[in-house]
């Protein structure tokens, strides 16, 4: 799984009409949509009560248009970049030619009291062409729901990096949430004696997680806030990743892992070394500890990695090889 260096990209010539059917304004769903638009110049739509002529800002210098469902159905080649429960009711109205992306198993959670129509009852996913962006997700969807999908790697847009650097040794740029294990990073910070080697935290926060898990871990001393919705990722108009040595991402997603996330690709693109959770790495063969990334699964181990000096030249060189399929892929 995840051996994508030899990934062959199928040809495509149809212009897609991208539709974002979800509430989140931060995270991987948003970033995936942004890279598709910037890379292939597709148009973006959302569904509203009425059609608006004016465009609204989506972030990252991208605009979208609100359409009523009737007008949405007039568009060619509908492509759902993400869908959450707030928009499930729209899916039965879409044509069978619609394409849809499933990003991770959390979108496929089942419930006896509130069935998930994507995979329960109506099994709406069977009506569409389904794409998955990690092979673990592709396998999970097939093994558990007998729904086939096509695996395609994340598309990556090569943005310009022309801003002054933020200048620190290590950052984390994922959402601050339960599945991101930000508490593990903060516990490592407590063990690192040199303040310059501690991890600076950026990203949108789940306030429930912060309240229950991070309250006693000095979170607000290390959290620098949300970064601007632009590329390169900036804080106070300084490039967060430029000249940064390490990007720490302790993500674990049940029934997922092994492949890439946008935080990984952004780090690799800007020459940072990834420090990943070992459980994520074990789910595939793409990332190789000590070859194209580093790994930890405890605060003590992470603190040691960040405290020790090492030559990272080879790690950066090997990780750069992982980016090519994402630059070449066609969607």
Model-identified regions with their sequence ranges:
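A short, glycine/small-residue-rich beta-strand->loop->alpha-helix junction that serves as a flexible
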Residues: 20-35, 178-180, 255-257
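Extended catalytic core of nucleotide-activated donor transferases of GT-like folds
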Residues: 3-7, 51-142
């Amino acid at each position: 799984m995840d051996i994508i260096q030899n990934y062959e990209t199928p040809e495509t010539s149809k212009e897609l009409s991208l539709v974002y059917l979800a509430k989140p304004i931060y995270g991987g769903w948003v970033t995936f949509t942004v890279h598709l638009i910037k890379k292939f110049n597709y148009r973006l739509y959302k569904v509203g009560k009425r059609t608006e002529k004016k465009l609204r800002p989506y972030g990252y210098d991208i605009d979208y248009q609100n359409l009523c469902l009737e007008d949405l159905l007039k568009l060619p080649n509908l492509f759902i970049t993400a869908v959450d429960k707030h928009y499930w009711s729209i899916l039965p109205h879409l044509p069978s030619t619609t394409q849809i992306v499933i990003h991770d198993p959390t979108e496929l959670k089942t419930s006896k009291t509130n069935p998930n129509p994507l995979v329960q009852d109506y099994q709406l996913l069977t009506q569409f062409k389904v794409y998955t962006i990690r092979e673990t997700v592709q396998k999970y969807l097939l093994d558990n729901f007998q729904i086939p999908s096509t695996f395609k790697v994340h598309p990556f847009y090569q943005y310009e990096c022309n801003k002054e650097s933020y200048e620190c040794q290590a950052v984390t740029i994922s959402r601050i949430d339960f599945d991101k294990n930000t508490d593990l990073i903060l516990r490592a910070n407590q063990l690192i004696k040199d303040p310059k080697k501690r991890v600076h935290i950026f990203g949108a926060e789940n306030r429930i997680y912060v309240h229950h898990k991070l309250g006693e871990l000095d979170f607000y001393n290390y959290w620098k806030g949300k970064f601007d919705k632009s590329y390169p990722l900036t804080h106070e108009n300084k490039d967060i990743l430029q000249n940064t040595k390490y990007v720490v991402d302790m993500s674990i997603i049940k029934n997922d892992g092994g492949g890439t996330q946008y935080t990984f690709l952004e780090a690799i693109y800007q020459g940072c070394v990834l420090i990943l959770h070992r459980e994520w790495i074990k789910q595939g063969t793409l990332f190789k500890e000590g070859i194209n990334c580093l790994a930890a699964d405890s605060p003590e181990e992470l603190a040691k990695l960040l405290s020790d000096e090492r030559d990272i030249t080879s790690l950066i060189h090997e990780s750069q090889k992982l980016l090519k399929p994402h630059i070449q892929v066609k969607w």
